[in-house]
Amino acid sequence: MAVHHSTRPFTPGTAPLVSFAEEVFGYLPRADQRRWAHAYLEGLLSTPGKKTVRRLAAAVSASPTASQSLHQFVNASPWDWGPALRSLAHWTLRRTVPRAWTIGTVVMPKRGESSVGVHRRFDPASGRTVNCQVGVGIFLSTETEPVPLGWRILLPSRWTDDDTLRERARIPESSVGDRPASAQVLDLVHTIHSRTTATPLPVVADMTSCTETGSLLRGLHRTGCDFVVAVPASLAVLPGGRTRGEAQDTPVPVRRLVYQGDGFGEVPALLGAPGPVPGGQPRRLLNTLVRLPERPGARPGTDTTPPVLRAFARRVPGRQADEPVWITNLTRHSAEELIALTGHHARTAGALRVLEDDFGLRDFEGRSFPGWHHHMTLVSAAFAYSRLADATAARTDRPLAVVRSA
C-alpha cells in the first residue's frame, strides 16, 4: 500500500495560490468555476491520504454542499482543459531550465466497468492482469523535477466502437478511431508544440511495452523531433551506415545488432551513468547505426528514405538482459549526452510515483472523459505549484545544450 505524505508545507488560502489559480484557470467564464478550481487545488495540496472529492471538499469548506459542488465542477461542468494546460506550460517554462520532453504512463486500477476507458490488461509493474484505466502524460523535464503538462487516456475499441458507451462517457468524436499508445504520444508531442514556443527539446520515452514503436519513431522523424526512445528488444531494424546488400536488407531484432554485432564499437567510461555496476566493473556503451524497414503494407518506393539512427545500450556485466535498448536520431552526440538524456525517463517515473502517492493522480472517482481530463489537469497544476511556486520567473527561450543532428 502506498504511503501518503505531505510533500510541501502549505497554508490554505495563501495569496500565491490565489494568483496561480487565477493565472491558470482565470479563463473559465463563471466565477463559481474559478472558485472551485482554486478549491480543488487547495484540497489537493492540503489533504493527506486519498484525494476523494468528499475529503477535498471537507478540507476547504464547511458547507454541506461543497462536496456536491466540487463533484459537479470536475465531472459535469463543460469547461475546456486545453487553455489551462497552455497557461500551465507557460508558467512552468518561465521558472525552469527545460531539458527534454518525457513520456510517462500510469496504470489506474478500477473496480467495475463504468469508468471511461476501463479495460483489462497486464500491468508489468505488478506482474498481474488488472482492471484499469491507462493514462499517458507528457512532462517537461527540467534541471530539478519533471512537470506534467498534458494527458491522454487510452481508449480500447470497446469504448470507441459502441455509440452508447461513447455517449454515456462523453467521448468526443476527435478521440474515436484507432488510437494506440504510439498515436497518443505523437498527439501529445504535437499538442505541446502548438502550446509553447520554447526551444525545441528532444523527446525521451520508454516504449518497450509498445507494439507500434516503429510507427512512433517514424512519426517523430516526420515531425522533425529529436528523440531518444527505449524500444522492444525484438524491434526489427536494418543495419545502417554500411553499403546496402542482400544481407543488410533483412530485418533483425535490434538487440542482436547492438549486443552481438561485429565491430560496431563500444564507448567506455560513462561517468555519472545511472545505476550501480556489480563489483566496480566498468560501464560501456554498445552502439550501432540502424535503419527502420519500410512500413508494413507500404508500396515499394512510397516511403521516404529511412533515416540512419543510433541504437545503443549500456553493457553492465551481470545484468545484461535488464538493460533497455534505446534508439535515437541524435547520431552525433557523445555517450555521456545520450545517457544523460535517458536519465530523464527515470526521473519522470519518480515524479509519477509522487503524483500517485501525494497528489491523487489515481483517485479520480468520476466516469466521464471530460471529468478524467479535468482531474488530471488539476493534479498537474497542483504538482507544478508545489514544486515551482517559490522559483523566480525568467525567460522561456533559454537555449538547450543539445545540438541537433544534421
PLM-predicted stretches and their roles:
Residues 1-19, 25-33, 155, 244-298, ...:
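A short, flexible helix-boundary coil/loop motif
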Residues 2-71:
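Gly/serine-rich nucleotide phosphate-binding loop at the start of the catalytic core
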Residues 107, 257, 332-366:
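Short amphipathic alpha-helical "interface-anchor" segments enriched in bulky aromatics
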Residues 126-197, 322-323:
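Electropositive, glycine- and tryptophan-enriched low-complexity nucleic-acid-binding patches
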Residues 78-157:
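Active-site-proximal, Lys/Arg-enriched surface segment
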Residues 146-147, 159, 228-232, 237-344:
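An anionic, glycine-rich sequence signature occurring as long contiguous blocks
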Residues 56, 99-109, 138, 201-210, ...:
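Short, conserved catalytic/metal-binding motifs centered on acidic residues
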Residues 169-241:
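Domain-level cores of phosphate- or acyl-group-handling catalytic modules
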